[in-house]
């Protein structure tokens, strides 16, 4: 979601955003209870709209995220909770007295059905520090590498991976990583490093590393010069879309804001639906180069009908009727 709410010191949920031209895009102030009910109603509808293999990511202020998680547990089921992701949004700072500085917000990740959700298990590259740390050796061509044992855990009683190689026995409780004949080929290619004591190890090069699994702390800082308040980091949105959807799938952002989610979806060949109640937001989105799309301006009467609808099919029937 593009629209973020924050909790003030008096416990009220605020949503007051200014566009780049200082035009107010949103202006709401609700009690925490009102806001939680506001979110609950929308989450119930989103659950009905979500495909059986779909996922939902809710980006929220850290002061209210723990309340929202309880609601999402109720709506989607505790078993469908996948992650509470900490997103580093800014450089360290401390504007609070007698408290630690805040540099993160939260992304709650749930699925419709954890046994069936799309999960593409994408990898991300190592950063420069990780490369230097993991691949500390440099060969004669300037390539960084590290070494690993020729053997791996688990004993095999029979077969070539249990036999000695060049008179070197397999350590107890271990087996060769590959057929010893492959070791001969690797050694001829210079891919095995021998120590001064005659211990062989396999070379692994940094430039052949396929990347690392994504963890639950993300470093996607807010855009430096946003075109719209609460604009999200597009690389973060691309990562989410790549992980939890496939080409041709639908991506829905029901607080579309500047349309960054829609832009990322369009780039990654996903179909997209963006919704926003702010005329300023809609104007910004329509100016983005998003290719061909259909735009519906729902009148107040139609919006109220959808708001009061209890099931996905009812909502879709109302939208279809409004087209006539």
Regions flagged by a language model, labelled:
Residues 1-284, 291-292:
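Core catalytic lobe of class I
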Residues 279-324:
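PRPP-dependent phosphoribosyltransferase catalytic core
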């Amino acid at each position: 979601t593009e629209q973020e709410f924050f909790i003030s010191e008096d416990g009220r949920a605020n949503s007051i955003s200014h566009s780049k031209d200082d035009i107010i895009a949103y202006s709401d102030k609700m009690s925490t209870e009102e806001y939680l009910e506001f979110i609950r109603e929308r989450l119930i509808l989103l659950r009905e709209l979500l495909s059986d293999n779909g996922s939902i990511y809710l980006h929220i202020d850290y002061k209210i995220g723990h309340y929202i998680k309880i609601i999402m547990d109720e709506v989607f089921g505790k078993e469908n909770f996948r992650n509470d992701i900490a997103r580093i949004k800014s450089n360290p700072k401390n504007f609070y007295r007698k408290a630690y500085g805040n540099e993160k917000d939260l992304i709650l990740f749930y699925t419709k059905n954890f046994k069936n959700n799309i999960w593409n298990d994408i990898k991300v590259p190592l950063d420069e520090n990780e490369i230097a740390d993991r691949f500390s050796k440099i060969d004669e061509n300037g390539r960084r590498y590290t070494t690993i044992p020729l053997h791996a855990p688990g004993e095999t009683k029979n077969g070539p991976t249990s036999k000695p190689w060049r008179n070197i026995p397999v350590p107890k409780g271990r087996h060769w990583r590959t057929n010893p004949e492959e070791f001969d080929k690797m050694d001829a290619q210079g891919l095995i490093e021998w120590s001064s004591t005659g211990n062989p190890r396999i070379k692994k090069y940094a430039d052949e590393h396929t990347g690392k699994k994504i963890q639950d702390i993300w470093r996607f800082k807010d855009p430096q010069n946003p075109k719209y308040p609460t604009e999200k980091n597009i690389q973060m949105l691309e990562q989410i879309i790549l992980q939890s959807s496939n080409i041709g799938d639908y991506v829905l952002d029901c607080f579309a804001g500047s349309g960054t989610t829609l832009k990322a979806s369009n780039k990654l060949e996903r179909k997209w639906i963006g919704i926003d109640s702010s005329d300023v937001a809609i104007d910004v989105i329509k100016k983005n180069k998003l290719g061909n799309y259909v735009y519906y301006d729902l009148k107040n009467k139609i919006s109220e009908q959808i708001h009061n609808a209890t099931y996905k099919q009812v909502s879709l029937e109302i939208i279809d009727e409004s087209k006539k």
